[in-house]
Amino acid sequence: MMDKKCTLCFLFLLLLNMALIAAESEEGANQTDLGVTRNKIMTAQYECYQKIMQDPIQQGEGLYCNRTWDGWLCWNDVAAGTESMQYCPDYFQDFDPSEKVTKICDQDGNWFRHPDSNRTWTNYTLCNNSTHEKVKTALNLFYLTIIGHGLSIASLIISLIIFFYFKSLSCQRITLHKNLFFSFVCNSIVTIIHLTAVANNQALVATNPVSCKVSQFIHLYLMGCNYFWMLCEGIYLHTLIVVAVFAEKQHLMWYYFLGWGFPLLPACIHAIARSLYYNDNCWISSDTHLLYIIHGPICAALLVNLFFLLNIVRVLITKLKVTHQAESNLYMKAVRATLILVPLLGIEFVLFPWRPEGKVAEEVYDYVMHILMHYQGLLVSTIFCFFNGEVQAILRRNWNQYKIQFGNGFSHSDALRSASYTVSTISDVQGYSHDCPTEHLNGKSIQDIENVALKPEKMYDLVM
């Protein structure tokens, strides 16, 4: 019941945010990109003229070129025979701000004039020299991101349908899976909205509406939820195996608080700090250390989770080596999936600060980071659902029943149903042990359950 209420609440918030962003986008569409660029240039021109008037007059000996405004950038006094240099402006989308602009002061103390026009000239050619390649790479990364989140949403929704439809899958660990999957679905939806409606809408970013900041706040909050629900998975397994030694039930209320409630704290602190100390338009810039308010707790959650999982493996290998050997093997299967996911979901925070230098290295880095960041939902659903032995057994059983019911040319249908029941029962027992071992054993050993499961098969042999 709580899952359904949380789902409806989050979907309502997402739809409301989408409507606000769409309304702001239509309202700001009248202000064209050209108008935004013109405002930037006029602001830079005003600041340049103020600087020209306020800076002290050049007192040094020798010839020099006077300070000037060339129409796009402001230039200081430069000694004759030198070349002045600064970064390209960000007025235009096809300009690369990491490239350089040059302006030459000749030996006579005059700014260089272009021979074709006989007018003072600044070399902006490098600003869009490699624009075509960079735009192509940016588009590839954009489509890679959208496809990744689209596949993640599709796979996660299919997984949630499977978990909700098959009641035999209901257990506490599957409940944690459902919440983890739902957090990834919400995060992917918000990311797609942010990339399509905010990040690529220069007019909307220029107007700086509240809705785009709300979108960024929700995005950062849901990103935190992803990692803290992964922490919940690790804590659950650690409590089940190490602390309570295969306890039957745990109170999930604390997991809901940690997974959905705690990420609100860093998200709110970041929003307050951002509005006070780095209140850029739509909070879209990543060039601020305030993002450590979000990334710090996430890294801490990953480290704690990794510690829990390694401790679980230690216990399963040592303490349960002699006793509960069969159970320890089954628990190891459940731990293995989480142990694989934690490094994969956390590697982006290890690689993020170490951006390599060089054109090819940077491009490879961008592709790897985008795959690691935007295909997480697909990875989570694949490991926790599609590779889950219990899910595979349930789907296999229903597929076999479907073939028996609707297939043609089968004889002895009653016997085949009995055989299908026998196979599915064995598969279900083995599959249940993968994710919910203690909740399905009910105090019996593995051998006892296998003996019960084999009884229909023996009866089938007698009938045949």
Swiss-Prot record:
Site features described as Required for RAMP3 interaction, chain residue numbers: Q250
Residues with PTM Phosphoserine: S420, S445
Required for RAMP3 interaction, as annotated region: 288-289
Gene3D superfamilies: GPCR, family 2, extracellular hormone receptor domain, Rhodopsin 7-helix transmembrane proteins
Record-marked site positions (Required for ADM interaction): Q202, M373
Pfam families from the UniProt entry: 7tm_2, HRM
Transmembrane parts of this sequence: 140-164, 176-198, 210-238, 253-273, 290-314, 330-351, 367-387
SMART domains in the record: HormR
Molecular function via GO: adrenomedullin binding; adrenomedullin receptor activity; calcitonin gene-related peptide receptor activity; calcitonin receptor activity
GO biological process terms held by the UniProt record: adenylate cyclase-activating G protein-coupled receptor signaling pathway; adrenomedullin receptor signaling pathway; angiogenesis; calcitonin gene-related peptide receptor signaling pathway; calcium ion transport; cell population proliferation; cell surface receptor signaling pathway; cellular response to sucrose stimulus
Extracellular side: 24-139, 199-209, 274-289, 352-366
GO cellular component: adrenomedullin receptor complex; CGRP receptor complex; cytoplasm; endoplasmic reticulum; endosome; lysosome; neuronal dense core vesicle; plasma membrane
InterPro entries xref list: GPCR_2, GPCR_2-like_7TM, GPCR_2_calcitonin_rcpt_fam, GPCR_2_CGRP1_rcpt, GPCR_2_extracell_dom_sf, GPCR_2_extracellular_dom, GPCR_2_secretin-like, GPCR_2_secretin-like_CS
Subcellular location: Cell membrane
Family in the record: Belongs to the G-protein coupled receptor 2 family.
Positions in the Cytoplasmic compartment: 165-175, 239-252, 315-329, 388-464
Site (Required for ADM2 interaction): S286, H295, W354
Residues making up the signal peptide according to the UniProt record: 1-23
Natural source organism: Rattus norvegicus (Rat)
Protein name: Calcitonin gene-related peptide type 1 receptor
Name of the gene encoding the protein in the UniProt record: Calcrl
Site entry (Required for RAMP2 interaction), positions: T288
Bilayer disposition of the protein: Multi-pass membrane protein
SUBUNIT field: Heterodimer of CALCRL and RAMP1; the receptor complex functions as CGRP receptor. Heterodimer of CALCRL and RAMP2 or CALCRL and RAMP3; the complexes function as adrenomedullin receptor.
Function: G protein-coupled receptor which specificity is determined by its interaction with receptor-activity-modifying proteins (RAMPs). Together with RAMP1, form the receptor complex for calcitonin-gene-related peptides CALCA/CGRP1 and CALCB/CGRP2. Together with RAMP2 or RAMP3, function as receptor complexes for adrenomedullin (ADM and ADM2). Ligand binding causes a conformation change that triggers signaling via guanine nucleotide-binding proteins (G proteins) and modulates the activity of downstream effectors. Activates cAMP-dependent pathway.
